[in-house]
Design a protein with these regions (language model features):
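N-terminal helix-turn-helix
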Residues: 1-88, 252-256
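Short, structured helix-loop boundary elements
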Residues: 11-15, 70, 83, 87, ...
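Short amphipathic alpha-helical signal-transduction/dimerization elements
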Residues: 26, 145, 149, 153, ...
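A cytosolic small-molecule/anion-sensing beta-strand core signal
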Residues: 63, 111, 220
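All-alpha effector-binding/dimerization core of bacterial HTH-type transcriptional repressors
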Residues: 81-126, 153-154, 163, 184-187
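Short, solvent-exposed recognition segments
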Residues: 127-200, 267
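Extended hydrophobic
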Residues: 173-247, 266-267
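Short, highly charged C-terminal tails/helix-capping segments
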Residues: 256-267
Length: 267
């Protein structure tokens, strides 16, 4: 009696295995043997899947190095980023932060020497701020602006300090001397957040953190803002990890991963 042919993997199973190969390579696995061990699939099947992925440009093979992610994934990544605007991706996270804090929430991107506001969720405490969606404010005097500058150097920081004035003339007296401004920016850059201590509007304080994309580049910043009575220094310090967590969640939507999750290529 002729033995029945072995059942072939279903389309869903094949897809899942193909994705497992891609994820394995993305995690730093470079040779076929290690990919097999990582995903728990026979060598012949893994080789067939990897060959198909190379042919379709989802993977590529570099001599002396092994498998790497292919150009098709780069193309799809950029397409995915363009298909869904940043503000749309960020909105659920901003709304959650607004509910938790009761304060005004901002999302901004850099536009030259200014912070351009993409989103604003007003707070529940009855105060009104000058910020508006589509408006610009100087980078060096806003919390989101400083957060957008955290990867810059000191020459850029000083250039931005002199590039714009606070939106309120009454806040002009709060402008810091160059060295004090640099000291603060150094501290902010080391810690990954920024404060607005009434630098732009009297009595308005802000806690901000940068948003990064898959390349770890700062592409936006998120902030929580309120008046001094609602935002004493103790609360500002307490808000830092909360705002950073929201910024990290938005960054994750853009493909960013924490440094500890980045694996070195296998040698």
């Amino acid at each position: 009696m002729t033995a029945a042919p072995a059942p072939t993997a279903s389309g869903t199973q094949t897809l899942a295995r193909g994705l497992a190969v891609i994820h394995s390579v993305a995690a730093g696995t470079r040779d076929l043997r290690d990919i097999c061990a990582r995903i728990g699939v026979a060598r012949s099947t893994t080789h067939r899947l990897a060959s198909c992925l190379v042919q379709e440009r989802y993977l590529r093979v570099l001599p002396g190095y092994g498998y790497t992610l292919g150009p098709r994934l780069i193309e799809l990544g950029f397409q995915a980023r363009e298909d869904i605007p940043l503000a749309t991706l960020a909105r659920p996270h901003l709304e959650e932060l607004a509910r938790a804090s009761g304060d005004t929430i901002h999302l901004a991107v850099r536009d030259g020497a200014d912070a351009l506001y993409l989103e604003k969720i007003p707070g529940k405490k009855g105060l009104e701020m000058r910020s508006r969606v589509g408006h610009r404010m100087p980078l060096a005097v806003t919390g989101v602006g400083k957060a957008l500058l955290l990867d810059g150097d000191e020459l850029e920081w000083l250039a931005m300090l002199h590039a714009g004035a606070p939106v309120s003339p009454r806040a002009a007296g709060n402008t810091l001397p160059e060295e004090r401004f640099l000291d603060r920016m150094r501290d902010y850059a080391r810690a990954g957040y920024a404060f607005d201590l009434e630098d732009n509007e009297p009595s308005i304080r802000c806690v901000a953190a940068p948003v990064r994309d898959a390349s770890r580049t700062i592409v936006a910043a998120v902030s929580v803002s309120s008046t001094v009575p609602y935002m004493p220094m103790e609360r500002m310090r307490d808000m830092v990890p909360i705002v950073q967590e929201v910024a990290a969640a938005i960054s994750g939507e853009l493909g960013w991963r924490p440094a500890t999750a980045q694996r070195r290529p296998a040698r």
